[in-house]
């Protein structure tokens, strides 16, 4: 996720509070022997604006608030499509009766429990062994949900999408009547931008909050017999991306493959940072869902606003985050309709991210529940829509 200059103020606190790796942990932090190498990477900071940088220069850009896509391994992303997919979304939500009992089943306590475990890893840095371990733990949770729901008997499954850097992305699939696909995404990795390979990075908000938000939405979605039996019009996928912090690496790899193989993705929603509200409240503003309006599909975004109005108990606020601010940018570049929602107006979002201070105690689980309601409402409505 993004990094603001305000986060630089957390440097001294981060260095003071973040423990260096203890003796018994030293073999686990980094998969690659060199924490920072002289290898150069091709990044894109705006559409068509590219430059070569070292790894340390990547982190310096992030510390200074510059988002980018690292396109070194995916330079072809977006070049194979002749035009963007044009999808006609429903004019309004229509499945309120079916969704009412599902929405009531969403659980703050389950999100809290999952996030407690997820943030207990020293870091989820994508090049670290902890990043690999956290991804394996998360895949196990997803597979257990599918098995416990009996959805595996109807073809639902979850798997790793493998990457070269150690931490793999995760894709959970619930087949529908057609191969046309609706994707819900969050990123699983975390980072401490001051010393990524050493300092702790609990990543509670960025993006542990989004990770457990969509995990909880998946759990409840799987209680729908119509969904697990494949009666939905469209196939549903939940993605947990690796290496978002390194330049949207995991999501680029996935959507590059989807573009190459002609996958028909009708919609993609990214949930990145869903739990922090204190700055909004301190500013005297009402709690709200931040709906990103730049570099997104306007029609999907308009439908998401209707979903918030129908299924959430708080309002939305329109806001902007710039180019490549989260993984929806990878789907968009591949030509797929994508959207992004965040915890607040962007200016009030969490400034503890990318430090050791991004911890569970600063999050509002009632607010995360609103994001889970949005996720569940959207994916259920689109599962049965003729897109």
Curated annotation (Swiss-Prot):
Gene source species: Sclerotinia sclerotiorum (strain ATCC 18683 / 1980 / Ss-1)
Maturation propeptide residues: 19-86
Glycosylation sites: 179
Family annotation (InterPro entries): M28_fam, Peptidase_M28
GO annotation, biological process: proteolysis
Protein name: Leucine aminopeptidase 1
Assembly behavior: Monomer.
An example Gene Ontology CC term for this record: extracellular region
Positions contributing to Zn(2+) 1 binding: 187, 206, 272
Function: Extracellular aminopeptidase that allows assimilation of proteinaceous substrates.
Entry similarity comment: Belongs to the peptidase M28 family. M28E subfamily.
């Amino acid at each position: 996720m993004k990094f603001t200059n305000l986060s630089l103020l957390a440097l001294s606190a981060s260095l003071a509070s973040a423990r260096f790796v203890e003796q018994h942990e030293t073999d686990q932090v980094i998969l690659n022997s060199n924490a920072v190498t002289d290898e150069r990477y091709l990044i894109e900071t705006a559409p068509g604006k590219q430059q070569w940088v070292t790894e340390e220069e990547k982190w310096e850009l992030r510390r200074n608030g510059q988002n980018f896509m690292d396109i070194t391994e995916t330079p072809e992303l977006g070049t194979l499509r002749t035009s963007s997919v044009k999808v006609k979304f429903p004019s309004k939500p229509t499945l309120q009766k079916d969704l009412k009992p599902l929405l009531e089943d969403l659980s703050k306590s389950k999100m809290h429990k999952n996030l407690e475990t997820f943030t207990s890893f020293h870091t989820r840095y994508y090049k670290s062994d902890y990043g690999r371990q956290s991804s394996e733990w998360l895949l196990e949770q997803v597979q257990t949900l599918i098995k416990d729901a009996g959805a595996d008997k109807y073809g639902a499954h979850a798997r790793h999408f493998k990457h070269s850097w150690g931490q793999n992305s995760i894709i959970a699939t619930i087949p529908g009547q057609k191969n046309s696909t609706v994707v819900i995404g969050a990123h699983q990795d975390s980072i401490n931008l001051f010393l990524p390979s050493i300092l702790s990075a609990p990543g509670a908000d960025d993006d542990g909050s989004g990770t457990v938000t969509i995990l909880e939405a998946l759990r409840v979605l799987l209680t729908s017999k119509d969904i697990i039996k494949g009666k939905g019009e469209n196939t549903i996928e939940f993605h947990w991306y690796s290496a978002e912090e390194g330049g949207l690496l995991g999501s680029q790899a996935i959507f590059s493959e989807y573009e190459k193989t002609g996958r028909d993705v009708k919609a993609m929603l990214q949930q990145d940072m869903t739990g922090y509200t204190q700055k909004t409240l301190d500013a005297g503003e009402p709690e709200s869902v931040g709906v990103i309006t730049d570099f997104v599909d306007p029609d999907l975004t308009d439908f998401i606003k209707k979903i918030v109005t129908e299924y959430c108990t708080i309002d939305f606020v329109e806001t902007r985050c710039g180019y490549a601010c989260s993984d929806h940018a990878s789907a968009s570049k591949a030509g797929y309709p994508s959207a992004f929602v965040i915890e607040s107006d962007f200016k009030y979002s969490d400034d503890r991210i990318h430090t050791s201070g991004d911890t569970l105690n600063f999050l509002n689980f009632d607010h995360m529940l609103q994001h889970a309601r949005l996720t569940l409402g959207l994916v259920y409505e689109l599962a049965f829509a003729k897109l």
